[in-house]
């Protein structure tokens, strides 16, 4: 993780990227906020009740005097954000409903990002994934040409660094969805200083098995390659591969001679959410890889979701990643 953070620090130096941390009443989040404030790379905006946050800071012996602290219930920004929210959700949300929703720290924080008063948001230490992602999908929405958001994990051990996706969001994917995830994952790799070599995974390697599931991945490979070419994306996307053919040169030489990737993939697109979620947890628990994420991709502005079992370090690291995404 240290190598990745060094890459991110180079990208973020002098950029003053502002990241909203809605869960300021959580001690892990507040501690991470003070650490971020001390770096000069990421500027945290902390949400919460002032009395509760200041009391927690005293208890933890934290200096939060230089951190911007906003209480959604009493903020001078609320009226402006309510009007903007009603306009964004035209015909779907009344002003009264918006007033109530923006008392919620995740909705308020997401509106800060949408209004350009912050560059990204990190939440989930005390909220479910739905609580974090729902406001983003309603307000920030996906980028043009992208029909869905997806969740990748950075899998890191020593000098090794890989991206696994989608491991968090989409339970059902067709060829178009897999192709989108492949292209967005390649873009994520580029933004984090990687040379993207994207393997689209299956239980088949280059036609070694026949089934509708294999055909789906084969079609996704063609769509992803076409989209990458149209966007002049500096990435190699190939498939379909079994995992060993994607990661072991000797296996690739036997199973996929002549393929664009020869066992040197660093971005892996799984054929289903089941496979991706199981795959990253096997690598984490049996392989000893650090799993950083899920990092959400495909949104107009970055919003990322922590695990409720997260550590201070997780909050800190994901804030750096979110800040780097904001510069894309």
Curated annotation (Swiss-Prot):
<dbReference type="InterPro" id="IPR050500">
    <property type="entry name" value="Phos_Acetyltrans/Butyryltrans"/>
</dbReference>
<dbReference type="InterPro" id="IPR042112">
    <property type="entry name" value="P_AcTrfase_dom2"/>
</dbReference>
<comment type="similarity">
    <text>Belongs to the phosphate acetyltransferase and butyryltransferase family.</text>
</comment>
<dbReference type="InterPro" id="IPR002505">
    <property type="entry name" value="PTA_PTB"/>
</dbReference>
<keyword id="KW-0808">Transferase</keyword>
<dbReference type="GO" id="GO:0006085">
    <property type="term" value="P:acetyl-CoA biosynthetic process"/>
</dbReference>
<dbReference type="InterPro" id="IPR012147">
    <property type="entry name" value="P_Ac_Bu_trans"/>
</dbReference>
<dbReference type="GO" id="GO:0005737">
    <property type="term" value="C:cytoplasm"/>
</dbReference>
<keyword id="KW-0963">Cytoplasm</keyword>
<dbReference type="GO" id="GO:0008959">
    <property type="term" value="F:phosphate acetyltransferase activity"/>
</dbReference>
<dbReference type="InterPro" id="IPR004614">
    <property type="entry name" value="P_AcTrfase"/>
</dbReference>
<comment type="pathway">
    <text>Metabolic intermediate biosynthesis; acetyl-CoA biosynthesis; acetyl-CoA from acetate: step 2/2.</text>
</comment>
<dbReference type="InterPro" id="IPR042113">
    <property type="entry name" value="P_AcTrfase_dom1"/>
</dbReference>
<protein>
    <recommendedName>
        <fullName>Phosphate acetyltransferase</fullName>
        <ecNumber>2.3.1.8</ecNumber>
    </recommendedName>
</protein>
<dbReference type="Pfam" id="PF01515">
    <property type="entry name" value="PTA_PTB"/>
</dbReference>
<keyword id="KW-0012">Acyltransferase</keyword>
